[in-house]
Design a protein with these regions (language model features):
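Detector for small/aliphatic-rich hydrophobic stretches
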Residues: 1-65, 79-85, 225-227
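Helical mechanochemical/support elements of P-loop NTPase systems and associated helical scaffolds
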Residues: 14-17, 29, 41, 45, ...
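Hydrophobic/aromatic beta-strand patches that form the interior of the parallel beta-sheet core
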Residues: 31-33, 64-66, 88-90, 145, ...
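Conserved inter-motif catalytic segment of the P-loop NTP-binding fold
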Residues: 36, 58-128
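A contiguous pocket-lining binding segment that forms or flanks enzyme active sites
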Residues: 111-152
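Glycine-biased, low-complexity coil/linker segments
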Residues: 203-207, 212-213, 217-218
Length: 228
């Protein structure tokens, strides 16, 4: 799993590192991160989990991670800054129905700052499941995020971020070069009008300073570098 080292936000934003991007996810609403493997989607998710489990600023910093494909690597999560003692890991063994039921149950439980449903390539989530999860989280303080390879039309998600891989980064001189990391782009695929307040620039002092090289991209796009 890659680890974030820097973030370049859209023009007009304070360069507060990746925190500005992670601060977009609204509590009490369903959000999505979509993108294929090696696109930075999983690494972005780990960065968010790390922020919440180490800050303790929301709901005690407790996170529930529903792992549809049993793909989470605890060692990589710890290297990304996740406090494993604040993480509830639910392994679903590739069973979509089990994953959906677990997420529906956990999002109704008080005390979680974040509930993640990571489906990866498991399959499209039924429209009825989207609606049920949205109703379950609505009005509360929990952030609910689903991650999958593709976005499903008709999803009620308030925020949808799409990731795509740009290029690898190499280290050393030829012929002894080695892969140092990956570069990916994160873009706002959808933001519901009723929640545009979540897109305002973060205030000064909110970020922990994952340094960006410049204001790259345009509109709601970020360029992220991930170290391996």
């Amino acid at each position: 799993m890659a680890i974030p080292i820097e973030s370049s936000p859209p023009p007009g934003w304070e360069r507060e590192g990746i925190d500005g991007l992670l601060g977009l996810f609204p509590p009490g609403r369903l959000s999505e991160i979509v993108g294929p493997r090696s696109s930075g989607a999983s690494s972005l998710l780990l960065a968010l989990i790390a922020r919440i489990t180490t800050s303790g600023s929301q709901g005690g910093g407790q996170v529930a991670f529903v792992d549809g494909m049993d793909a989470l690597d605890p060692a990589s999560a710890a290297a990304a800054g996740v406090d494993l003692s604040a993480l509830l890991w639910v392994k679903c063994g590739g069973r979509l129905r089990v994953a959906l039921s677990a997420a529906d149950l956990l999002v109704r439980c008080p005390g979680f700052a974040l509930v993640v449903l990571d489906l990866d390539e498991l399959g499209p989530m039924p429209a009825s499941a989207h609606m049920r999860l949205q109703r379950a989280v609505e009005g509360g303080d929990t952030i609910l995020i689903t991650r999958s390879a593709r976005h499903r039309e008709g999803s009620p998600a308030s925020l949808v971020l799409a990731t795509r891989r740009l290029a690898p980064r190499w280290m050393g001189l030829r012929p002894l070069t080695r892969l140092a990391g990956l570069r990916s782009e994160v873009s706002i695929f959808r933001s519901r009008p009723s929640h545009t307040h979540t897109l305002s620039p973060p205030g000064r002092g909110q970020g922990e300073g994952l340094k960006g090289e410049g204001l790259k991209g345009e509109g709601g796009r970020w360029t992220l570098d991930w170290t391996l």
